[in-house]
């Protein structure tokens, strides 16, 4: 299982909340990730691709899936550009089944690294074709736009009407394809198709392609808000994971399953601590589902790791406000007060961070949907303060909305192609995602109250943690200091062993 962007700091945030928050929602205050780490073997994983220090999700996933060093942004290739066999292909070659589950697009970098071969991660239309050609047994996530023909972009077209009939109108659709291939129709004879959670629940055997959104699935905060809604159409992470286990386990030879918590990464990119905590909680729920399934078996290997860390996140101590001096009962403090020189971040912050009800992404989408005359600092204050325990002022909202020349501007670049961007006053080179920089600025505005610091809007080189849980003779190889290629090689060795062994890998995305 892969928490995309899940470094040790993100695991620390989750664990702090579980253990120290007064209103922790974690069962017995013990996360599933903690169970895996305590009951299995723990390793530390370097993740740099060939020739660089920092990994993107495509190279990171490719290294985990193949056991070979990749180049940045490559999918399913080694650093020389040669197509290399991935663990899904290994599983199929030896008669096992394979599945991929994500809360992002099925064609996004992390799942792509396990089942496709393309020169660049941006080739999502081609990645979808690769997945069809590989006949991955279970594919669950979002991203319909890469599977349906270009004609779908006209909502008045017969193509759009036919698609709505096929999907039951589960959600509005667009297309990013530049041809008229409808991959859904191409696979319909080989796969059962599901576009909502009810249809997914009905499937009890066989291959399944479940696509539940035009792009990514709802984020963890949206999921929490809609969980009890009888009209909810999207399956949860837990529901997708449980269904994948149910279907793949029907192969007596065994299976490989990769489950990604992809929006951990996105919360890190956006410097959104509240969303990050909820994404970690949601991913941990999926880990718990697999842990409970695995714990009474002797034939299954569960790996929980990150592909890289995102945002250089952390709690930090601060120079203000300095807490008042207090008296302690211990004899050492009989004549002196307990008076730390700095504010070391009280645990009450954890419940306040958890109280956030919308991600920064949702907040800014609401702001952008206002009529232009209403897109004012005052309205941004209303939106943010209505969804967060950390309130902002009009002046702070104005800071979030202030623009400046884009010093990273590159004409035609997929991300850095706008002449102006929200104004970042330092480390501009590490904030590259255009209008999303407003979210980074919002994270900075509340940082002092949260005691949260962010080092970037991109990835860091921080090593990640891996927890291996399962048969003792298998998990030992995942302890110690490793590189992600070591993890990939040992996963392939484990699934290729003569003893029926299942590898379940979990990771983060860039």
What are these regions (language model features)?
Residues 71-74, 96-101, 139:
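Short secondary-structure capping/junction motifs at helix and strand boundaries
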Residues 88-89, 93-112, 499:
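Glycine-rich phosphate/pyrophosphate-binding loops
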Residues 77-85, 122:
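Glycine-rich anion/phosphate-binding loops
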Residues 15, 68-70, 104:
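Short glycine-rich, polar/acidic loop-and-turn segments at beta strand-coil junctions
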Residues 6-12, 16-62, 108-508:
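A post-motif C-terminal structural segment
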Residues 52, 56-79:
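A glycine- and small-residue-enriched flexible loop/hinge segment at structural boundaries
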Residues 1-3:
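Short hydrophobic beta-strand that contains or immediately precedes a catalytic carboxylate
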């Amino acid at each position: 299982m892969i928490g995309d962007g899940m470094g040790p700091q993100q695991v620390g945030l989750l664990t702090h909340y579980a253990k120290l928050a007064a209103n922790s929602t974690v069962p017995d205050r013990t996360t599933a990730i903690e169970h895996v780490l305590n009951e299995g073997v723990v390793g530390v994983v370097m993740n740099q691709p060939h020739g660089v220090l920092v990994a993107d999700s495509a190279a990171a996933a490719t290294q985990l899936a193949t056991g070979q060093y990749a180049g940045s942004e490559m999918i399913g290739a080694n650093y020389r550009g040669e197509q290399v066999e991935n663990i899904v292909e290994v599983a199929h070659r030896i008669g096992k089944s394979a599945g991929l589950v994500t809360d992002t697009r099925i064609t996004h970098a992390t799942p792509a690294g396990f089942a496709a071969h393309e020169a660049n991660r941006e080739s999502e239309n081609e990645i979808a074709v690769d997945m069809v050609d590989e006949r991955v047994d279970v594919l669950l996530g979002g991203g319909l736009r890469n599977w349906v023909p270009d004609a779908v972009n006209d909502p008045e077209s017969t193509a759009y009407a036919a698609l709505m009939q096929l999907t039951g109108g589960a959600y509005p659709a667009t297309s990013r394809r530049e041809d008229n291939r409808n991959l859904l129709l191409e696979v319909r004879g080989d796969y059962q198709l599901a576009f909502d959670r009810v249809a997914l629940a009905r499937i009890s055997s066989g291959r399944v392609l479940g696509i539940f959104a035009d792009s990514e699935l709802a984020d963890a905060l949206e999921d929490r808000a809609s969980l009890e809604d009888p009209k909810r159409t999207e399956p949860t992470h837990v529901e997708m994971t449980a269904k994948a286990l149910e279907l793949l386990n029907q192969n007596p030879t065994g299976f490989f399953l990769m489950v990604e918590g992809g929006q951990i990464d996105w919360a890190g990119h956006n410097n959104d601590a509240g969303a990050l905590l909820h994404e970690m909680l949601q991913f941990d729920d999926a880990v718990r589902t697999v842990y409970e399934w695995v714990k009474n078996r002797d034939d299954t290997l569960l790996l929980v790791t990150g592909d890289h860390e995102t945002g250089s996140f952390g709690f930090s101590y601060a120079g203000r406000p300095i807490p008042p001096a207090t008296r302690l009962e211990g004899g050492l403090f009989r004549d002196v007060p307990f008076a730390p020189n700095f504010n070391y971040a009280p645990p009450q912050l954890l419940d306040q961070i958890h109280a956030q009800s919308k991600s920064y992404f949702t907040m800014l989408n609401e702001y952008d949907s206002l009529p232009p005359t209403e897109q004012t600092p005052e309205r941004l204050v209303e939106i943010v303060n209505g969804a967060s325990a950390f309130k902002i002022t009009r002046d702070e909202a104005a800071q979030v909305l202030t623009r400046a020349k884009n010093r990273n501007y590159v004409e035609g670049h997929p991300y850095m192609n706008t002449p102006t961007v929200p104004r970042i006053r330092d480390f501009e080179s590490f904030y590259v995602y255009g209008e999303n920089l407003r979210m980074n600025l919002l994270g900075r505005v509340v940082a002092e109250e949260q005691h949260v610091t962010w080092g970037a809007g991109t990835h860091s080189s921080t090593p990640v943690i891996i927890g291996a849980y399962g048969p003792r003779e298998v998990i030992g190889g995942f302890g110690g200091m490793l590189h992600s290629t070591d993890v990939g090689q040992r996963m392939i060795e484990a699934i290729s062993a003569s003893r029926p062994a299942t590898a379940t890998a979990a990771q983060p995305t860039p």
